[in-house]
């Protein structure tokens, strides 16, 4: 998924697939990426653009600024042209509210970037709220920049991954709460656009934690992210052997102990990632589920 501001001058070309951005999903942002005094104008322009769109080669998600903006979009936006809505600064209340407002007809992707995400009880309640609305909510994404701001006005340091900052501990806490409810989490963005080396390091850490999708905020990040998702050949070999119907209960390979009862889900997810990588070439997936 690639985030683009709703007031981007070439938005029509982006949504029509006339810009080679290397992604299969676009998130059109009407929240923080657009000045408050320009959001209504941008929303109206987005409606006109979608109405004139004959076909959309990429899935399109829209990120409204708030619940009032969602109401306006549900009334005027050609919702048959979009895949769903992104819920910024999700709370338990807004998760239930947005699901109700959309009548369960549109996918809702909550962003975990409110104060609730910093609290153990709050994280558990957020996870329970998301789990209450399958398949409307296929997963949730972690919002890094807002969490940095909430932790005393911090910003991601240069030359570090997010796991080398206080937000890393928040992510681990969110994983515990959401995995307990069976809700998949998508990895946070990186606003250090020029630092592709540490972006790739971060994606590896995302994968090690079970975070599958990584959103890009600039086209230059797409290839670096997608290349990092390619499994190593030795991992693919191990995963296939683990999932063999006649695999032993425990066996060794490449100096590792493999146990299908424990490693089966890891193997299934890795082979899914391998299949997506091979079939899509350089086009990343947005799936959280």
Each language-model region and where it sits:
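Expand to "…catalyze enediolate/carbanion chemistry for C-C bond making/breaking, isomerization
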Residues: 1-289
């Amino acid at each position: 998924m690639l985030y683009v501001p709703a007031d981007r001058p070439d938005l029509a070309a982006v949504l029509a697939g006339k810009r080679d951005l290397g992604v299969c999903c676009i998130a059109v942002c009407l929240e923080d990426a657009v000045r408050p005094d320009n959001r209504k104008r941008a929303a109206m322009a987005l409606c006109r653009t979608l109405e004139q769109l004959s076909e959309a080669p990429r899935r399109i998600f829209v990120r409204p600024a708030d619940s009032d903006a969602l109401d306006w979009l549900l009334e005027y936006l050609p919702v048959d042209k979009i895949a769903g809505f992104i819920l910024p600064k999700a709370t338990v209340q807004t998760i239930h509210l947005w699901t109700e407002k959309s009548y369960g007809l549109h996918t809702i992707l909550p962003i975990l970037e409110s104060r609730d995400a910093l609290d153990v009880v709050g994280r558990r309640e957020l996870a329970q709220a998301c789990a209450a609305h399958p398949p409307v909510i296929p997963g949730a994404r972690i919002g890094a920049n807002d969490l940095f701001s909430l932790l005393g006005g911090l910003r991601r340091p240069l030359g570090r991954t997010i796991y080398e900052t206080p937000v890393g501990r928040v992510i681990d806490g969110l994983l515990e709460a959401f995995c307990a409810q069976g809700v998949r989490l998508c990895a946070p963005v990186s606003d250090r656009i020029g630092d592709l080396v540490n972006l790739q390091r971060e994606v590896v850490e995302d994968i090690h934690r079970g975070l599958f999708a990584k959103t890009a905020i600039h086209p230059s990040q797409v290839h670096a992210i997608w290349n990092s998702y390619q499994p190593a050949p030795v991992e693919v070999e191990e995963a296939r052997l683990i999932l063999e119907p006649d695999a032993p209960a425990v066996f060794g390979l490449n100096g590792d102990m493999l146990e299908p009862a424990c490693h089966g889900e890891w193997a299934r997810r890795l082979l899914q990632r391998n299949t997506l990588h091979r079939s899509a070439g350089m086009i990343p997936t947005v799936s959280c589920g």
